[in-house]
Amino acid sequence: MLPGWHSIASLVKRIDIPIVASTTPAEIAEMQQDAWPEAGKYGLGWVYFSVILLAISTIIRFYHLWGDQIRIALHKEDMAGTSPYVTSPQEEYELPSAATDSSTTHFFPARGPLPSTNTTKQQSSISTIAPLNNTIAFVRWIFYRPIPVLRIGKLRIGFPSLGASSIILAALIFVTLYSFVPQPLYYSSISIGSPPLAIRAGMIAVAMIPWIIALSTRANFVSILTGISHERLNVLHRWAGYLCLFLSLIHMVPFYVTPIWESTNFMYYQQYFPRNIYIYGTGWAALVPLIVLCLHSLPILRAWMYELFKLVHLPLSIIFLAMIFWHSKNFLASWDYLWATVAIWMLSYAVRLFYVNWSNPLRLSFLIGEECAVTILPQNAIKVTVATQMKWKPGQFVYLRMPGISLFERHPFTISSLCSGDFPSEYGENYRDLALVFRPFGGFTRNVFLKTFEYGPYKTWTAFLEGPYGGMKRDMAAFDDVVFFAGGSGITATASHLLNLIKKMRDRKAVTRSVRVVWAFRSPETIDWFREELRICRDFAPPNTVHCHFFLTGLEPHGQDQLAQNQFYQEMLRDKMYNTLEGMDKRNSAYIREEAAGDPEIEKELRRENEDAITALPLAHTLPHINTSRHYTSPMDNNYQHAPYPAPHVSPADTPFNFGFPPSSTVFPKLTTRVGTVPLQRNGWRIDYARPNIPQVLKDYSRTFGRRTCVFVCGPPSMRVEVSKAVAQLQQVVMTDSSKDEIFLHAENYNV
């Protein structure tokens, strides 16, 4: 055997130092402290930590899923014994003399006993356990609250949600303690073995890599088990990468504290390795890509050079993984974690083939994509309509690539249309119109706007879709009350949920009895984006179930001279919307013909039922009403008085449905409807001219909440923060009121 062979072998292995005849008893005793063969347990420690978190999240997900399905099933069972013509989940108060064959509820029924006042619905036994519901409410009271933004001069630093931050903090504490608490941190000499601290940190870092990749992929097992979509897991992906860098630095530093070149075995190291390679070259080869990956994923840098980030992130990740293979040399079964990483990565890409619209050979879009039309909406918004055989659920999003706009760019957009047989595409019964609505800001969206402006709305484009991804992990139909908050283009994530919920309510498949929509936008033209969807909600929702509250925030006074003029404009615009909605309470004739499907007898019956509704007497002229609602603080001076104007001579049948917004700057006087009897409770549409006072709005709504309420918000960060704080505060109602079981919050990402 060559001289010094044992020393060279020990340096090659770097850490597994064999016991030979020359090893002293003191060195043997020191080597047994946190021995090298047992160091693999530190990688398993991180695996156990991650699996426990995954198991808890999965159990919570399936607990809620089970409870939601049981409540919906019990509701269907209750509805099976009632008349299919009763469509309103709330009472409709009518006078006894106004009864018709279409009436549903009376103060005094014509025959039989008085109706029972006991309307308690069946509930899932496990979902009504008060201590469990109170515990969940207490956890939400804590974790629904957002972390305040840190301001350092002009720099604003945002943090993840409190729940995500708690997981990140727990992981940081775990890996730090697991690295530094076991002893020893160093050996007396690196000739005995590599520093135990470095080995512990290195094994934990390697064990984290499969989880980092799993949290980054679009189709991953974490989303399948927990119901949390990949875009929400991305924050954990980034912070897990930062923790991996933190552990890699801990792994590196001890090798410089006890450097190999101070050992007597350094000369043998030089004999075994080429002299032109740095001693720790393989470690630096893996560390540098990791540093770059973490730095350019910082929010401030990623937003500044997003296109570059997308271009280099994947290649850098592949280089990093290859360098880790080279550096670790399969010590302590480290390659098991790395091969698991490769398997997760490849499996994700294989599964993604089922998410693209051009990979199915049974579809006409196979390898060529699908046609789409692009329309410019008011306020320069863009609507892309793709006729596709793809199926999706409300609130999901897709990645859109249009080679005619940009060959390789792919961007996520929320689907604003409903995938239902009630809304077939003109391409055929097997197709549905997938609608994407977004504002042009820069890059891809700006190019879409410019190309559409250049070629016009009649040009068709090729679209390649990937998805759908995301969506809610809870079923809205299992909640008694649903409240939607939307800010500006955030209505895109709300529209499909609203249509789907109304459809289920009409089909008697939803527990929901009340739906409230609060939409804040700057310009009246914004409502044109979803004019047809709102018309459907008003015409087809069960009576007295959908209430829409619009907040027009774009009317800001610019001086004292405009104060009175803006106030007058507000009052007139509000009144016109009221009158439009009141004057169109009947079912639209076009929908009657569509529902009759060409059968004259059914159409005749539907029109007769429509005429049975209580109608209003002619309109009267009164002074404009000044709104004094406490839902907002108006910046206008309410002391300004206006004089009545003559009524315009416009036929209601010739007036297009415009939700109260005039097509020009002409304003109209208030027209108040007088009725000859007590009407049904169908007035649920309202508009105000200020920013919504969200805490007060939710507080007022909470007085009529049922046992379970869902609050959905999609809007700018300020709106999400206000809604989160308000819902967190309302958890006290659940903990103190036995008639309330749950107030659930779902906050949608405004940028997707």
UniProtKB/Swiss-Prot annotation:
Role description: Probable cell surface ferric reductase that acts as a negative regulatory factor of growth and development. Involved in kojic acid production through the regulation of kojA expression.
MF annotations from Gene Ontology: ferric-chelate reductase activity; metal ion binding
Residue ranges of domain Ferric oxidoreductase in the record: 201-348
InterPro entries, per the entry: FAD-bd_8, FAD-bd_FR_type, Fe3_Rdtase_TM_dom, Fe_red_NAD-bd_6, Ferric/Cupric_Reductase, FNR_nucleotide-bd, Riboflavin_synthase-like_b-brl
Localization per Swiss-Prot or TrEMBL: Cell membrane
KW Oxidoreductase (keyword) present: yes
Name of the protein: Probable cell surface ferric reductase kap2
Organism placement in taxonomy: Eukaryota, Fungi, Dikarya, Ascomycota, Pezizomycotina
Cofactor: FAD; heme
Keyword check for Transmembrane helix: yes
TM spans (from-to): 40-60, 157-177, 195-215, 241-261, 281-301, 306-326, 331-351, 482-502
Primary enzyme class: oxidoreductase
Residues covered by the FAD-binding FR-type domain: 349-475
Annotated membrane topology: Multi-pass membrane protein
Family named by the database record: Belongs to the ferric reductase (FRE) family.
One GO cellular component, as annotated: plasma membrane
Keywords: Cell membrane, Electron transport, Glycoprotein, Ion transport, Iron, Membrane, Metal-binding, NADP, Oxidoreductase, Transmembrane, Transmembrane helix, Transport
Gene of this entry: kap2
Recorded coiled-coil stretches: none
GO terms under biological process: copper ion import; intracellular iron ion homeostasis; iron ion transport
